[in-house]
Amino acid sequence: MKWLTLLAVAILAVGCHGCESGWVDIGGVCFGLFTESMPWADARTFCQGHGGDLAKVADADVLRDLYEYIITYGLSGSFWLGASDLTFEGDWLWVQDNSRVDRGTPFWAIHSGLFGWDHEPNGGTEENCLVLDETRKYYFNDANCNLVFHPVCMV
């Protein structure tokens, strides 16, 4: 009986899907969507302090599941992800492994611009960090790294 009690406590401490309490399993990876707002570099340090890094979202199913989680749980605001083109303008890389971020749909936002359809990323040297943008229905957008958004961490 003592063994079963310890097992139950261990399962509750880790969570149903192997993620710690407050984290969610999406695609077999534990994601944490936090309410604190901070610039991108601080968000990265914040995630590293939780034993992970800013999230890599390189799969359309994971992007959809993150969107559904945000909507289902009534979260608001935009969320930092773990990619930037800080090293070389226009070369978007995930910080975890330096792999390239896929361009275009289904990841990056497209919206009506002054001269037709405007495709993200479009911010040039002023917008070098990747955000799940609330104003773009949680598609990828490039943003100024000094803006304050919520971190999405992964472990």
Feature roles, as predicted:
Residues 1-155:
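Extracellular, disulfide-bonded carbohydrate-recognition/adhesion ectodomains
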